[in-house]
């Protein structure tokens, strides 16, 4: 036993090593694993991994087969961190079991065992194999005899030459246990050379044996014989938990035996079991305890059967059920550490301390894997490992034991400075200093020791319990803690207050959606205490942020009233006001019932359907605390715009009725229905839609609309209509009956149009008179029968082009660029339809008729004016009528010559003289050229400068008098007139507003005044035109 002062010195030394960092023993992060190194690998080294964490950082060493590896002596070994690197591995020196040791100042741990093996495959000996001679029908076994090797192998056989491998089937089998080739019944095609191919599953190296010749004997064919099992599994085969077990079975025989499997106990195979290689292999993946037992292979042919039996035994490596964990425990206390593992056979246990076997003594005992150490000392600290093992493996569990010794210390677990309780309550004052071993405690109130009595008692953990607290118990309490390493004190101040009471509690209320309400919660409390109001809604804390638009706390310091605005159905439920102080808490609850419009009805069904009715039933939904008064039904079809309220029987559905018949439905239409409930609050949410149903078929009732027609080609009667919408077709097989007859005839001609979307029908017959009237009607039908016809309407047959030309065609020259063509209309009976107008064709004498220009006039016009023509040139023209079918023949051609062009010389030397009411104009006479029209007169165009309306004065003289109020500026032009049109305009004259009694001007110099050599007032009778 170490003296207390020595233990304290040791603890202080360890604390200095750690500084402020927390000391920690080694803990493995990576441990080495079993490895197989391929002999001859290009990689010239192998690494066994080992890494541990700890503070201080661990250092490492390794053992091979239980002996330390001396890194300074063995140049082939190298440490890289904690990893062991083996350079140029050698199977003679390096094969074995490796373990890693990680050590720091707190102890040592040992890794799991890792086996290093070397995989190799040597060559077959070059030795000729003897010829195998058998009879036809006899079975044979060709031996492989693999060369020396290490590591798992796979086998195959070559027949004669590579790459012709033997294909396994019910007659031929290659054992992956022995490598031998088995042929149950030899056939002539089997004669040849057989070579065993052995492949390493680790290195992929492949070697070939010497060929074995197989020949047939000449002394006859082997007769039939019963099966002889040549490939069978061991009588007892251990199988590991979770492994894949493969049992081989193959027999020789004639005829070829059939292989079957079964369990000896008669239990069926589990679904995971697979039969492979034509039942020659039974495979059990993920082997478990229930897969253990006896298995039988039955080989059978017509000559008999043979059975091979074997037992699979289950084993499991140790697996931890309970690991050990780090423990920190006080000196002189006792340690009980239990580790438990499962496995078969049952594991045994041993313990290590700091990497070495734990030495048992009087204080240290191991029983059933559990470690007990009594009267702990600091020197018991270290790294411990529990090892569970059976013959199939072992597992390690590591943990650190820290044995601590310290004087009482309140710094890590200080006492509460203030404890508040209410009168009459029970209070416990804690006193739990950190101390190893645990400290003994005593108490003082002020300077007086606290003695135990019926209300005051000392707790086992050192705390003080006071029952039925009074005001006199208030004060300062000191806990004095002591062990063999020292003592310490802690203080708590106890405050005793009056209890909190709710003076105005919330009460049950009944409200409607949209209203607002206040739930009161007012209290009386000790003035020394702060108070907190908390509201709970249906057991959850009321969320004033998320539901801030509805919830708000109102009231003063002693009030926590809850206002709920614009109440919704979701606010219905239980409300609890929780009042908390630092000492106590009280609460009061109230139920709030919110009445709202009904919830959606449920389970809407269509119980019966006809062509125009549907009988519905439903179940009542939530009434939301207000009884349902009535129901309404809505329907929707693929053709409707949203949901529509429908007519029902009864017309008004009261709240106690849960069935109704919908009427006035369209036949053969797919409907959905939903139900809406209403109460005093209003209409609720609609139910979910019913399943889609289709009404029954019926005879159609609605004929097509907009029956009309006309147009088309020669000898056609075109009849058109608007198709009947699908929702009004009332059934399948819908179509149209088109009936027509010439006006005045009694017998109808009928035809059927089978497409419901067709909008027209064309009747063709050479006897149809163009543009003749027909009476037309269109009916409907479907598979149920014929429906009504539309009202009779008149439709005209197709037109033909007119057959006669217009008469009395004449042409008149209007100017140098215009002529007017006129004619008489053609008779209506000869128009062969509705006359649309006339087409005028014209060309000049120098052109060709084929390149003539054309102009159309609509309706019954009997003249046309042709513009943009060339002057003084002969033009030819003809006219024909046209309708929608085309144009008729042209009239006889007439000709006319356009007039000469107007003079190109404008009126010159225009002068003016103005008074306050008159303007006198003079200009020089315009003389026409030989190729121009003779001047017949003049036109004077005048307007105010602020307007666009032009007025015209016609005169046959070279002067004119304008009576004008000269109140603003005037713009004046002069043109010569001829039969060929108006000549070129003079320059514009601007006559300014008169400010003096007399003003003069001319086109040559408008700003100068030109005296006239002679002046004669001329009184003119004027004709004024407004030019556009």
Swiss-Prot record:
Q: Which InterPro entries match?
A: FN3_dom (IPR003961), FN3_sf (IPR036116), Ig-like_dom (IPR007110), Ig-like_dom_sf (IPR036179), Ig-like_fold (IPR013783), Ig_I-set (IPR013098), Ig_sub (IPR003599), Ig_sub2 (IPR003598)
Q: Hey, what's the signal peptide range on this chain?
A: 1-19
Q: Which CDD domains match?
A: FN3
Q: Tell me which SMART domains the record gives.
A: FN3, IG, IGc2
Q: Which parts of the sequence belong to the Ig-like C2-type domain? A: 26-117, 122-208, 227-313, 318-402, 408-497, 499-593
Tell where it localizes: Cell membrane
Pfam families linked: fn3, I-set, Ig_3
Can you give the propeptide residue ranges? 1003-1028
Supply the name of the protein.
Answer: Contactin-3
Name the species this protein comes from: Homo sapiens
């Amino acid at each position: 036993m170490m003296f207390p002062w020595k233990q304290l010195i040791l603890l202080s030394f360890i604390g200095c090593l750690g500084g402020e960092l927390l000391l920690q023993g080694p803990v493995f992060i990576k441990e080495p694993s079993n490895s197989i190194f391929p002999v001859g690998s290009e990689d010239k080294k192998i690494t066994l991994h080992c890494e541990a964490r700890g503070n201080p950082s661990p250092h490492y060493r390794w053992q091979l087969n239980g002996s330390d590896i001396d890194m300074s002596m063995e140049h082939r070994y190298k440490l890289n961190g904690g990893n062991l690197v083996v350079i140029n591995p050698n199977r003679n020196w390096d094969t074995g079991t490796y373990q890693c040791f990680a050590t720091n100042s707190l102890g040592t741990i040992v890794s799991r065992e890792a086996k290093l093996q070397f995989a190799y495959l040597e060559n077959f000996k070059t030795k000729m194999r003897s010829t195998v001679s058998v009879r036809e029908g006899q079975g044979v076994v060709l031996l492989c005899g693999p060369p020396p090797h290490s590591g798992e192998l796979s086998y195959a056989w070559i027949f004669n030459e590579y790459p012709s491998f033997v294909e396994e089937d019910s007659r031929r089998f290659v054992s992956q246990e022995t490598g031998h080739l088995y042929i149950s019944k030899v056939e002539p095609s089997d004669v040849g050379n057989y070579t065993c191919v052995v492949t390493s599953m680790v290195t992929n190296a492949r070697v070939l044996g010497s060929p074995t010749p197989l020949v047939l004997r000449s002394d006859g064919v082997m007769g039939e014989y019963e099966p002889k099992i040549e490939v069978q599994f061991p009588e007892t085969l251990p199988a590991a938990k979770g492994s894949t077990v493969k049992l081989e079975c193959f027999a020789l025989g004639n005829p070829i035996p059939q292989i079957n499997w079964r369990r000896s106990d008669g239990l069926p195979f589990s679904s995971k079991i697979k039969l492979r290689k034509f039942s020659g292999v039974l495979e059990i993946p993920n082997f478990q305890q229930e897969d253990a037992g006896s298995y039988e292979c039955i080989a059978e042919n017509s000559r008999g059967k043979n059975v091979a039996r074997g037992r699979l035994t289950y084993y499991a490596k140790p697996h931890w059920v309970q690991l050990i964990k780090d423990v920190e425990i006080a000196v002189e206390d006792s340690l009980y550490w239990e580790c438990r593992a499962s496995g078969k056979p049952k594991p045994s246990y041993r313990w290590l301390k700091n990497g070495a076997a734990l030495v048992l003594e009087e204080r240290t005992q191991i029983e059933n894997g559990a470690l007990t150490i009594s009267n702990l000392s600091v020197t018991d600290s270290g790294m411990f490992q529990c090892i569970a093992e059976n013959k199939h493996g072992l597992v390690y569990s590591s943990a650190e034991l820290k044995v601590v010794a310290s004087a009482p210390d309140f710094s890590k677990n200080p006492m509460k400075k203030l404890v508040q309780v209410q009168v009459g309550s029970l209070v416990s004052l804690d006193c739990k200093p950190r101390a190893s071993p645990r400290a003994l405690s005593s108490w003082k109130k002020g300077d007086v020791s606290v003695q135990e009595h019926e209300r005051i008692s000392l707790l086992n953990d050192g705390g003080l319990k006071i029952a039925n607290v009074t005001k006199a118990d208030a004060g300062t309490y000191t806990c004095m803690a002591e062990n063999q390493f020292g003592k310490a004190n802690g203080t708590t101040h106890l405050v005793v207050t009056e209890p909190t009471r709710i003076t105005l509690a919330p009460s049950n209320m009944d409200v409607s959606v949209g209203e607002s309400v206040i739930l009161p919660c007012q209290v009386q409390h000790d003035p020394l205490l702060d108070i907190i109001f908390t509201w709970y809604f249906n057991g959850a804390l009321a969320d004033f942020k998320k539901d801030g638009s509805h919830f708000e706390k109102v009231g003063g310091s002693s009030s926590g009233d809850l206002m709920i605005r614009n109440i919704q159905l979701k606010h219905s439920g239980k409300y609890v006001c929780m009042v908390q102080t630092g000492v106590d808490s009280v609460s009061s609850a109230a139920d709030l019932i919110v009445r709202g419009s009904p919830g959606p009805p449920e389970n809407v069904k269509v119980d019966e359907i006809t062509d125009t009715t549907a009988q519905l039933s439903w179940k009542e939904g939530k009434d939301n605390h207000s009884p349902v008064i009535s129901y309404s039904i809505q329907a929707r079809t693929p053709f409707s715009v949203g949901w529509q309220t429908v007519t029902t029987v009864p017309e008004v559905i009261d709240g106690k009725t849960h069935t109704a018949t919908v009427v006035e439905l369209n036949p053969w239409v797919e409907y959905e229905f939903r139900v809406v409930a209403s109460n005093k609050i209003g209409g609720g949410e609609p139910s979910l839609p019913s399943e889609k149903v289709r009404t029954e078929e019926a005879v159609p009732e609605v004929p097509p609309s907009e029956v009309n027609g006309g147009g088309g080609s020669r000898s056609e009667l075109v009849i058109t209509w608007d198709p009947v919408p699908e929702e009004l077709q009332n059934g399948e097989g819908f179509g149209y009956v088109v009936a027509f007859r010439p006006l005045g005839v009694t017998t109808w001609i009928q035809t059927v149009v089978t497409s419901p979307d067709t909008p027209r029908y064309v009747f063709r017959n050479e006897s149809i008179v163009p543009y003749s009237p027909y009476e037309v009607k269109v009916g409907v039908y479907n598979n149920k029968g014929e429906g009504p016809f539309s009202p009779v309407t008149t439709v005209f047959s197709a037109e033909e082009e007119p057959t006669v030309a217009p008469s009395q065609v004449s042409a008149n020259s209007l100017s140098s660029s215009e002529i007017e063509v006129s004619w008489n209309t053609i008779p209506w009976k000869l128009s062969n339809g509705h006359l649309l107008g006339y087409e005028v064709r014209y060309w000049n004498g120098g052109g060709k008729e084929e390149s003539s220009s054309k102009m159309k006039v609509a309706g019954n016009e009997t003249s046309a004016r042709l513009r943009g023509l060339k002057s003084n040139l002969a033009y030819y023209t003809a006219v024909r009528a046209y309708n929608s079918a085309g144009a008729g023949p042209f009239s006889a051609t007439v000709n006319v010559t356009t007039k000469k062009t107007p003079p190109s010389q404008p009126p010159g030397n225009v002068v003016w003289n103005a008074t306050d009411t008159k303007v006198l104009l003079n200009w020089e006479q315009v003389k026409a050229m030989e190729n121009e029209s003779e001047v017949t007169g003049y036109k004077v165009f005048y307007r105010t400068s602020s307007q666009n309306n032009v007025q015209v004065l016609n005169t046959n003289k070279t002067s004119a008098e304008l009576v004008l109020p000269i109140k603003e500026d005037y713009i004046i032009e002069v043109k010569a007139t001829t039969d060929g049109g108006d000549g070129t305009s003079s320059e514009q004259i601007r006559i300014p507003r008169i400010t003096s009694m007399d003003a003069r001007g001319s086109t040559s110099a408008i700003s100068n005044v030109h005296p006239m050599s002679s002046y004669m007032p001329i009184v003119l009778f004027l004709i004024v035109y407004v030019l556009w």
